[in-house]
């Protein structure tokens, strides 16, 4: 993905502007070093270092019209989720200051603590399989810790007042948002695929509704949001995509490579998946790759053939299941 296209979407600030935000929160801005961090598809992120004391600043986009609907106006939710993670001793940043007033910045921003470590995605290919297996086991344990938080109602942070009777309604709404976003930019998903997706959801309504745990679920613990240190998980970053939903919406259940790590399953404590669970996982895989395709189209990042090939594979897999 071209970096300049991503930069055009993100709400980047000058060093002087960041110093003003920092001073407003911490009372001074002496001797700070500001580093723009890469990665992510939504927010601009900076590392601010004051004589070795590091904090991270995240700034939401000022124009969210090019974001998929489910990702709009959710930095407030990340702040709330980081507060919640503190109560379960989760390796996440601690929220330090959240501001959505618009006084110093036209969009919401969040200061949080810094977690040492290197990006797992960027270093995974250099790790031995045994280390990767151990990390995936840890990811399972951590994902399960979040999902231990239960609730009786579904919740989508971008639509906090929306009510859902069951998982079929919840998942169908997510797909409807995506498909409407796709239609708004005349996205070509292939012959009849708009209708096929809706038919798949209807066909598997019973499987979608056969859920045992409605829990807080981190839908975006993918390798790019994982930090490692000394071959262990040191932290998870990005907490805007947590929903109260089916626990199988946790990302590592439905990674887009079409596989579910056995070590993740062991760490999560769910080694056996019944047929309905396998079907839901495939539906969630389809959702994730469709989300990536629509996101790239909305932001004019380009068309990536591998995404469309993956999407076609997900469609074929779901139409073959009996």
What does each model-found stretch correspond to?
Residues 282-291:
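Hydrophobic alpha-helical segments that form the core
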Residues 35-170, 187:
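ATP-binding pocket architecture of kinase catalytic cores
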Residues 6-8, 292-322:
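ATP/Mg2+ or Mg2+-diphosphate-binding catalytic cores
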Residues 58-59, 96-97, 155-159, 216-219, ...:
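Short beta-strand segments
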Residues 214-217, 222-282:
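Active-site Asp-x-Gly
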């Amino acid at each position: 993905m071209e970096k300049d296209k991503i930069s055009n979407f993100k709400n980047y600030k000058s060093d002087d502007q960041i110093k003003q935000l920092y001073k407003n929160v911490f009372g001074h801005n002496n001797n700070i070093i500001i580093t723009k961090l890469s990665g992510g598809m939504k927010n601009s992120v900076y590392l601010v270092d004051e004589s070795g004391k590091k904090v991270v600043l995240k700034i939401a986009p000022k124009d969210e019209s090019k974001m998929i609907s489910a990702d709009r106006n959710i930095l407030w939710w990340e702040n709330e989720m980081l507060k919640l993670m503190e109560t379960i001793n989760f390796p996440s940043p601690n929220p330090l200051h959240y501001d959505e007033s618009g006084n110093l910045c036209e969009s919401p921003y969040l200061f949080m603590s810094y977690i040492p470590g290197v990006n797992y995605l960027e270093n995974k290919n250099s790790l031995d399989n045994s280390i990767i297996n151990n990390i995936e086991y840890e990811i399972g344990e951590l994902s399960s810790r979040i999902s231990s938080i239960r609730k009786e109602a579904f919740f989508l942070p971008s639509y906090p007042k929306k009510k859902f009777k069951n998982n079929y309604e919840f998942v169908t709404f997510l797909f409807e948002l995506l498909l409407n976003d796709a239609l708004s930019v005349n996205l070509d998903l292939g012959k009849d695929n708009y209708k096929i997706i809706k038919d798949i959801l209807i066909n598997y309504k019973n499987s979608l509704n056969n859920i045992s745990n409605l829990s807080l679920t981190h839908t975006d613990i993918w390798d790019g949001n994982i930090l490692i240190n000394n071959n262990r998980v040191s932290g998870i970053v990005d907490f805007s995509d947590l929903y109260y939903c089916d626990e199988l919406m946790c990302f590592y259940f439905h990674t887009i490579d079409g596989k579910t790590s056995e070590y993740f399953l062991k760490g999560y404590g769910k080694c056996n998946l019944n047929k309905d669970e396998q079907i839901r996982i495939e539906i969630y895989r389809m959702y994730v790759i469709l989300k990536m395709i629509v996101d790239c189209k909305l932001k004019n990042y380009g068309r990536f053939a591998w995404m469309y090939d993956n999407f076609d594979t997900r469609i074929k897999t779901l139409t073959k299941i009996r």
